[in-house]
């Protein structure tokens, strides 16, 4: 009887830990912690810091592509970029796994989406995403 009870308690604890780990890795959404833009007449670059809210980053390139899509779609939870003023011609992103890492400056990775000709603002990230290439830093 005691052995059966111990097994049930151990299984319950393991399921609870698995649920907590699942939530910490996949249950929270990424969000922007800060953003800034700089530019001239024909070139505008958006710099963004993103907090992933995960424990582990398994595929940095896939993660970078997801962040690029969220920037293009303007679909981050707490930030709306003002694309009505000017749409970026370049995007630079610093990625942090969690808020604590962001506060201490411990980035997971960083990347940029740029055009071949970085000076000319012919293409923007919203209307011409195929003209941009991913550069992992």
Question: Which residue ranges define each predicted feature?
Answer:
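Short amphipathic alpha-helical surface micro-motifs
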Residues: 13-15, 27-33, 72-78
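C-terminal partner/receptor-binding element of secreted or periplasmic proteins
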Residues: 113-137
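Hydrophobic membrane-insertion alpha-helices, especially the h-region
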Residues: 7-25
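Positively charged n-region of N-terminal signal peptides that target proteins for export
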Residues: 1-5
């Amino acid at each position: 009887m005691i052995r059966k009870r111990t097994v049930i308690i151990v299984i319950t604890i393991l399921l609870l830990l698995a649920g907590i780990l699942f939530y910490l890795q996949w249950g929270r959404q990424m969000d922007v912690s800060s953003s800034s833009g700089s530019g001239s007449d024909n070139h505008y670059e958006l710099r963004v810091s993103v907090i992933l809210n995960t424990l582990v980053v398994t595929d940095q390139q896939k993660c970078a592509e997801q962040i690029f899509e969220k920037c293009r779609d303007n679909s981050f939870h707490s930030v709306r970029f003002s694309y009505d003023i000017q749409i970026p011609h370049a995007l630079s992103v610093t990625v942090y796994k969690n808020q604590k890492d962001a506060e201490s400056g411990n980035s997971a990775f960083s990347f940029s989406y740029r055009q071949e000709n970085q000076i000319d603002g012919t293409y923007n990230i919203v209307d011409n995403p195929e003209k941009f290439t991913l550069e992992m830093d």
